[in-house]
Every structure is written in structure tokens, then in C-alpha cells.
Design a protein with these regions (language model features):
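Non-transmembrane, membrane-proximal soluble domains of secreted or membrane proteins
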Residues: 85, 91-93, 110
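Cofactor-binding loop segments of dinucleotide-utilizing enzymes, especially the Rossmann-like FAD-
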Residues: 50, 102, 134-135
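Anionic-ligand binding region
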Residues: 78-87
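Short gly/ser/thr-rich secondary-structure transition/capping motifs
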Residues: 4-12, 80-81, 137-140
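A cross-family acyltransferase "interaction/gating" segment
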Residues: 17, 58-61, 95-98, 107-166
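Generic preference for hydrophobic
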Residues: 12, 24, 47-48, 155-157
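Short glycine-rich anion-binding loops that position phosphate/pyrophosphate groups of nucleotides
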Residues: 28-30, 102-106
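Catalytic core of membrane glycerolipid acyltransferases/transacylases, capturing the structured
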Residues: 3-5, 20-76
Length: 166
């Protein structure tokens, strides 16, 4: 992938937990996290990103071409409606979802508070949550730069957590 071309090594731990349908929840420390998360999850996984991603060169076009949904974080009514529609679609089609539940990138690598959308989606769909932890990606791509820094990145997929269906 892109990270390999940049000289980065990605080591995956717990790959046996990459089974869907599920909600894959990864921490957010790099602009590459969404693509890394989707790459490591089973076929039939859609990602969810803020609507502004479409303005990012390369990322936005790739996101749209892949058919991944976006959410308007600035309008809570629209955000809730799009999350409900996503939940219905995922449940009806047997797909998985990958999310970065912090909702924004951590500049330090420290975990930020989670947004509520992941809980609502899990309860609506009844899908288990597979926690993912990416270590080493902080600073892999500086803001405003297209250059990917070489890193040793470790991604840990943890055992799924069942969620009650609402």
C-alpha cells in the first residue's frame, strides 16, 4: 500500500479479530488512519468520515470513488439522520463499518474523548465493536504536506465487544 511505498512497516496484531460484520473503531492520530483501518478490515466494510474529507486532495476523491459515506458534524440533526440511514443500510446489507470515534485527529497520539455516534450505531445495528489501536502513526503525514514520513506502525485488533440491540 501507500505506507509500504513510503518505507513504513505496518505490523498487525490480532488479525483473527478482523471478522465482520462489525464496527471497527480505531484511534485517530494520523490522516492515514481511515485508509489504514479500512485496509485491515474485511471486505464489505465502509468507512465513515466528516463531510470535509471531500476537499482533501487525493483522500477526498478516493473516499468518494469508493462510495464511503460522510457525516455533517456541524449539523447535529443531519448527522443523526445520516447515522440512522447508515445503520439501516449496514444492517440490511450485512456490511461492517470502520469509524474513528474520537472524531478528530489527536496531535499528540493521546486518546481523545469519543463521540456518541459509535454507541448509537452499535445499539441500532446490534453489531459488535472491534476496538483497534494504532501505535506509531503520529506525524506520519504532516498537515499541509503530501509527503508520508517513514514509520514503524503497529495496529492491534482487540477481541470484539458485543453490544445490545436497541
Amino acid at each position: 500500500g501507500v505506507l509500504g511505498l513510503a518505507g513504513s512497516r505496518v505490523t498487525v496484531h490480532g488479525a483473527e479479530h478482523a471478522v465482520g460484520p462489525a464496527i471497527f473503531a480505531n484511534n485517530h492520530s494520523s490522516n492515514l488512519d481511515a485508509f489504514l483501518t479500512i485496509w485491515l478490515t474485511p471486505r464489505g466494510t465502509v468507512g465513515l468520515a466528516k463531510k470535509e474529507i471531500v476537499r482533501y486532495p487525493f483522500y477526498g476523491q478516493a473516499w468518494l470513488l469508493a462510495g464511503h459515506p460522510t457525516v455533517d458534524r456541524g449539523n447535529s440533526e443531519k448527522a443523526r439522520a445520516s447515522m440512522r440511514a447508515l445503520g439501516d443500510w449496514v444492517r440490511d446489507h450485512g456490511f461492517s463499518v470502520c469509524m474513528l470515534p474520537e472524531g478528530t485527529r489527536s496531535r499528540t497520539g493521546r486518546l481523545l474523548p469519543f463521540k456518541k455516534g459509535i454507541v448509537h450505531l452499535a445499539v441500532q445495528t446490534g453489531l459488535p465493536i472491534v476496538p483497534m489501536v494504532t501505535v506509531g502513526a503520529v506525524g506520519s503525514r504532516d498537515k499541509g504536506s503530501f509527503r508520508i514520513q517513514t514509520r514503524d506502525i503497529h495496529v492491534h485488533l482487540l477481541p470484539p465487544r458485543d453490544t445490545p440491540r436497541g
